[in-house]
UniProtKB/Swiss-Prot annotation:
It comes from Geobacter metallireducens (strain ATCC 53774 / DSM 7210 / GS-15). ATP binds at A14, Y15, S16, G17, G18, L19, D20, T21, S22, A41, G122. It is found in: Cytoplasm. It catalyses: L-citrulline + L-aspartate + ATP = 2-(N(omega)-L-arginino)succinate + AMP + diphosphate + H(+). This is Argininosuccinate synthase. Belongs to the argininosuccinate synthase family. Type 1 subfamily.
Length: 406
């Protein structure tokens, strides 16, 4: 018999159909005895979404929302982040981190539509997602009730969840043979847990979904031209595309060439280290191309200041502060720097490697061959370097003189 929590009447659950949320849906019905609405955001999971509706109803959902948010995801979340060249700890392109604010945003919109007084998610008490979800919830409604089963129940391991699911007849796509969990959207797919908890063990090849093994990728390189306008990718090989279409196209191309695999031991927001394996084919290509166009269009000092902000911007996204005044402030500054980022980058894809081989801008190029050439020129007086170096070395020479007096 359900243990009724009289203060909670209706819950909107962020539901993926995976290990955690499949159990949570049933657990909420059993423990809270209230109406539970399952919400799944279509962020590009592909075939994973097909059984979601039936599975949710079979597990006890009173109502199910499956909303296509792919264009909004790429346009309003991924692209702003890529305008900042955000990368966490030098490797992670923040595919999971950037998805959570949008899921939470839509979840809160549904809660308002349905008159729900609570929301719930499947993030554990050890992870980053609990912070990302809940900071976003409170941005939209400071008084919302958040039900977090991982902080209440005694199912404290993946295997305990599997056993609970079997006991309750819940079909889940995880077995003892492949116990790792995954999270997929248009930007990436992530894997954690299981064999990946052995930091010395190489991830099994059958784990990867989006990318071919680099050694099995085509023996012939592929060249791709990506056009940018105000820092946003707008076309591939001359073909205009919507943000979601463009990223999907680059995902396919990159996946064929084994682009975008990352194996990272990262520092979580709560303080512990955790291993994550990621596939981000399209995002890897996009960031490389974006940086290339910046190289030819962005002023040196503007780039220096912007580059100094990348770690802070990435930390804010990783830690769940998307809807914060500090992230919005940085975004305003970054977007202003992107007004000149108009041009085309040419990248070469070959067996897991993505590198720039050309960049051009018809309207905003700062590259002037007359000044940059190593051949004879008429515009740069090399003797001017003497004064430049003397002025810039003044503090160093003074320091050396003063130390010599000691």
């Amino acid at each position: 018999m359900a243990k009724v929590h009289k203060d909670v009447k209706k819950i909107v659950l962020a539901y993926s159909g995976g290990l955690d949320t499949s159990i949570i849906l049933k657990w909420l019905k059993n423990e809270y005895g209230c109406e539970v609405i399952a919400f799944s955001a279509d962020l590009g999971q592909g075939d994973e979404l097909a059984p979601i509706r039936d599975k949710a109803f079979a597990t006890g959902a009173d109502k199910v929302y499956i909303d296509d948010l792919k264009e909004e995801f790429v346009r309003d979340f991924v692209f702003p982040m890529f305008r900042a060249n955000a990368i966490y700890e030098g490797h992670y392109l923040l595919g999971t981190s950037i998805a959570r604010p949008l899921i939470a945003k839509r979840q809160m919109e549904i809660a308002k539509i349905e008159g729900a007084d609570a929301v719930s998610h499947g993030a554990t008490g050890k992870g980053n997602d609990q912070v990302r979800f809940e900071l976003a919830y409170y941005h939209f409604d400071p008084a919302i009730t958040v039900v977090v089963p991982w902080r209440e129940w005694k199912l404290n391991s993946r295997q305990a969840l599997v056993n609970y699911a079997k006991k309750n007849g819940i079909p889940i796509p995880v077995t003892k043979k492949r116990p790792w969990s995954s999270d997929r959207n248009m930007l990436h797919i992530s894997f954690e847990g299981g064999i990946l908890e052995d930091t010395w063990a190489e991830p099994p090849e059958n784990m990867y979904v989006l990318t071919k093994a680099p050694e099995k990728a085509p023996n012939k390189p592929q060249f791709v031209e990506i056009e940018f306008k105000n820092g946003n990718a707008v076309a591939v090989d001359g073909e205009k595309m919507s943000p979601a279409q463009l990223l999907a196209h680059l995902n396919y191309i990159g996946g064929e060439h084994g682009i975008g695999r990352v194996d990272l031991l990262e520092n979580r927001s709560v303080g512990m280290k955790s291993r994550g394996v990621y596939e981000t084919p399209g995002g890897t290509i996009l960031r490389e191309a974006h940086s290339a166009v910046e190289q030819i269009t962005m002023d040196r000092e503007v780039m220096r200041i912007r580059d100094s902000l990348i770690p802070e911007y990435a930390r804010q996204v990783y830690s769940g502060y998307w809807f914060s005044p500090e992230r919005e402030m940085l975004q305003t500054l970054i977007d202003d720097s992107q007004k000149c980022v108009n041009g085309v980058a040419r990248v070469k894809l070959y067996k897991g490697h993505c590198r720039t081989v050309g960049r051009k801008s018809e309207t905003n190029s700062l590259f002037n061959l007359d000044f940059a050439t190593f051949e004879k020129d008429q515009v740069f007086n090399q003797a001017d370097a003497t004064g430049f170096i003397k002025i810039n070395s003044l503090r160093l020479r003074i320091r050396a003189l003063m130390q010599g007096k000691k």
